Amino acid sequence: MDKSLFYNPQKMLSYDRILNFVIGARGIGKSYAMKVYPINRFIKYGEQFIYVRRYKPELAKVSNYFNDVAQEFPDHELVVKGRRFYIDGKLAGWAIPLSVWQSEKSNAYPNVSTIVFDEFIREKDNSNYIPNEVSALLNLMDTVFRNRERVRCICLSNAVSVVNPYFLFFNLVPDVNKRFNVYDDALIEIPDSLDFSSERRKTRFGRLIDGTEYGEMSLDNQFIGDSQVFIEKRSKDSKFVFSIVYNGFTLGVWVDVNQGLMYIDTAHDPSTKNVYTLTTDDLNENMMLITNYKNNYHLRKLASAFMNGYLRFDNQVIRNIAYELFRKMRIQ
């Protein structure tokens, strides 16, 4: 297949963000490209790298790390010893499981400029996220990067879901129809894989998976873990009613009486006196702590809308937060 069809990270790198998320079709070459890039940086500039997976068992075959990219560097010796990577006899990088990040706190990595975290979004058949996973990655980044400027962490994933601990933690709501969603210090890239998909459909395996859910992810870069049920932008006639603060997120609740629908959105009226929270962690001035939603008119209406199917959510992230909220309210 033509090399130009595969993923090229140069545009993403040009934005120079410290934290980057690349979510692309399976087989498009994300992992391959993000092996080649740090190898080149080491050969040219002596910059080291760290390769991260979530758990130790995922690094069981790390000895094969260089196998697929060795052809790109015929004049260099690429060797793996344990969880260390060597290029031309010099230490170039480390493989680290995120689950043991605490053991790295006392280590120093002054020459590491790139961290690559592969498969940062959990797939259905994989192991769970580790507890406080985003904080674990941030701790690792802090240990490695310290206060240096020319550094970056690149997180790779197949198109599984835009609802994940990382986007929730940083309150990132990407437009899945845009290739680059750029924020102050972070970036989300969703590569266009149309030409790649067209060519891959011509292969025997491509024909096999075409039209299946797996094919939607692998060929079309569709987020197969994200249902569109109840996802709907609020109507122009909807009116703001109240806000709920949950896990640091402020959710605005809107009502369209003509359509008989209620909406949850990030948009809200900051001057409203109707602000509720369910936890003391979120409680602040000018908020009401609600321990039983049945005792509050607004939350009873919200629960009723949810249970009767006339509640809508602005996007996948908002829906995920709201579902956690309803579980907290003991509404299943």
Swiss-Prot record:
Result after altering residue 119 to D: Complete loss of DNA packaging activity
Residues at which ATP binds: 24-31
Region ranges (ATPase): 1-207
Record bears the keyword Cell cycle: no
Region (DNA-binding) residue spans: 233-332
Family assignment from sequence similarity: Belongs to the phi29likevirus gp16 family.
Function: ATPase required for the genome encapsidation reaction. Part of the active packaging motor via the binding to the packaging RNA (pRNA), itself fixed to the head-tail connector at the unique portal vertex of the prohead. Binds and supercoils the pre-formed, unit-length DNA bound to gp3 to produce an initiation complex for DNA packaging. Provides the energy to actively pump the viral DNA into the prohead. Approximately one molecule of ATP is used in the packaging of 2 bp of viral DNA.
UniProt-recorded name of the protein: DNA packaging protein
Organism: Bacillus phage phi29 (Bacteriophage phi-29)
